[in-house]
């Protein structure tokens, strides 16, 4: 493993899981005058993660790195959502009450981009709070990756520097069951983006080691070689990755990745590692 790989691993273990905002702040969540946002997914006391408004606020506050959770729509468009199951994230139950699957859940890849854009994020604040009530009355639409990148280009001149984008592939294994290759589509989109933005800093992150290895092997030449790869490690509860074994889905175990062999395998495809707190 290279020195950069080891240093990044230590940094992420110390800071904690970068899927949450990492910043200097007071106990009540209010940033101090000395606060400096390092990594943010846009989550705040009232704004849901991945909404354009929350990401704009993170950039305005000086976030140097923006964490983007990505899923696919029915028409293979990349959307900013923290989960493929969208009934806990949006008002999809109200807009499309008859579109759930037999398990009762609503999935991003059952809706076109146009349909997803018509949905509103549910407020991050507890139900009944002033901020939650105010947000619920407004329309905070689901955002496509292209929309965010377009917004970033517009405000770039107002920023101190173009932020690093950590693009996290959410539930690639579940997309595969729908004959959708989330990783390949995201990689192509980011390669196209980097080809026109020479100073763009982009990282693709995944909880699935096999998915990341396949992407690393298929990465193109030229500027796309500058795209970084981050191996995320979560708990063994199957929340992020599952494998089909003997006809049933089973939680993926990360135990092997904590061995010398596992780390060597990861270092062949990843530039860095991000650990969930419960995995430390």
Where are these regions (language model features)?
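Bacterial N-terminal signal peptides
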Residues: 8-18
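Phosphate-group recognition and catalysis centered on beta-loop-alpha active-site segments
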Residues: 20-280
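Bacterial N-terminal signal peptides that target proteins for export
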Residues: 1-9
């Amino acid at each position: 493993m290279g020195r950069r790989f080891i240093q990044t691993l230590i940094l992420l273990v110390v800071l904690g899981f970068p899927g949450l905002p990492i910043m200097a702040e007071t106990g009540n969540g209010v940033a101090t005058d000395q606060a400096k946002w390092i990594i943010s997914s846009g989550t705040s006391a009232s704004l849901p993660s991945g909404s354009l408004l929350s990401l704009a606020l993170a950039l305005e506050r000086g976030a140097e790195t923006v964490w983007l959770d990505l899923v696919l729509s029915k028409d293979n468009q990349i959307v900013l959502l923290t989960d493929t199951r969208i009934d806990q994230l949006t008002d999809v139950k109200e807009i499309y009450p008859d579109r759930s699957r037999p398990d009762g859940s609503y999935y991003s890849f059952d809706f076109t981009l146009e349909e997803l854009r018509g949905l509103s994020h549910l407020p991050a604040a507890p139900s009944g709070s002033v901020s939650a009530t105010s947000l619920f009355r407004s329309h905070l639409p689901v955002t496509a990756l292209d929309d965010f990148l377009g917004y970033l280009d517009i405000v770039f001149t107002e920023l101190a520097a173009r932020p690093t984008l950590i693009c996290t592939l959410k539930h690639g294994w579940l997309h595969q069951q729908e004959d959708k290759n989330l990783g390949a589509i995201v990689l192509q989109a980011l390669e196209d983006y980097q080809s026109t933005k020479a100073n763009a800093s982009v990282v693709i992150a995944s909880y699935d080691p096999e998915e990341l290895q396949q992407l690393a092997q298929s990465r193109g030449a030229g500027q796309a070689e500058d795209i970084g790869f981050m191996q995320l490690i979560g708990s063994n509860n199957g929340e992020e990755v599952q494998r089909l074994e003997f006809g049933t889905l089973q939680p993926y175990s990360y135990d092997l990745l904590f061995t010398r062999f596992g780390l060597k395998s990861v270092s062949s495809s990843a530039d860095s590692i991000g650990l969930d707190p419960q995995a430390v």
